[in-house]
Amino acid sequence: MKVVGNYRVNTANSSTDTSGEHLTCLRSQLFVAYRNGRVDEAVSLGFLDCWIGGDLTNFKGCYLTNQLPIQIFTAIFDMNTDVIILSQFMYYRLKNQKKKMIFQPQLFKDSITREKVRLSLWGVLCPVYIPYSFR
């Protein structure tokens, strides 16, 4: 125990001992996601962006304020974890997107309906195109 002012601080249970917990959470997250193959449906990209932004801010703050090396190491570890989870998210999103494209039927099977939809989309996206398209 260390005495700081009028308070005693137990340094054995400090908050820097959480890197083992981070590793356990990462390992279980990666294993369950690999087994299910549904990471893209469980987590949103916006959530991952906020999570990465928070960890990036944490690393930047630790580095710029000259924190303890263990804090900088933990921040780097968190950033690496975020990169792994984001790459896993993108991999399964592309993989599952290809599966969905194979099994989805075509919406407009005949060419006349496709042409009408294309012309109406051009009318919505480019209003200048409307007067010249029907002459």
From Swiss-Prot:
PANTHER family the UniProt entry points to: SEVEN TRANSMEMBRANE PROTEIN 1-RELATED, SOLUTE CARRIER FAMILY 66 MEMBER 1 LIKE
One GO MF term attached to the UniProt entry: L-lysine transmembrane transporter activity
Signal sequence region: none
Record-linked InterPro entries: LAAT-1
Cellular-component GO terms for this entry: lysosomal membrane
Protein name per the record: Putative uncharacterized protein SLC66A1LP
Gene3D superfamilies: 1.20.1280.290
